[in-house]
Amino acid sequence: MSNMVPVMDKKAFLRSFLKRHQLKRRECAWLLNYLMNDDTLMERVHFLNHSEGTPKALVISAQGIEQIPFSFRKKHHVTTDCEKAFHDIRLNQTEDIYIELHFQERLTCPQYLAVLEDNPYLPETQERAQAFERKAEALLQESVRLFQLKKLSEAIDEALDNGDKETFMELSEQLNRLRKS
């Protein structure tokens, strides 16, 4: 249930973030600037509150936060070397990059909340997506059924107006079957 966040919004957020917050590791600002300057890469960037389970994640912290300064995780390998992360991103530009940022008041920052996405790899996100899909399917089926009921009623009225008893009986039978379903 990933929502598409425009590249323009992601870049605006990162610019604002880098102006307002001092990162624990300077190389992280360099890495974020590198991402920001490449629209193709920015299309693959996703900001998450929790990056657990994602295939490729950057965890970056600002000063004043009790979190590790930086970590890069790809599959089951974790490193705190920003340069390794840069080389992996540069060499694998078709892979999505999930970024978990830690900074003061992140849950009340409107620009951050505007680019924040659900982690598609967390079980509760998948369950929520499946529940949403089931509800959407049920709504669609009910809409189709109501449309069919309306069309059948209109056709029955037309058959009555035309005095067509055979069509009236046939359509009435269809209408009754549809109402029971």
UniProtKB/Swiss-Prot annotation:
It comes from the Bacteria. InterPro entries: IDEAL_dom, UPF0302, UPF0302_N, UPF0302_N_sf, Virus_scaffolding_prot_C. This is UPF0302 protein ABC1905. Belongs to the UPF0302 family.
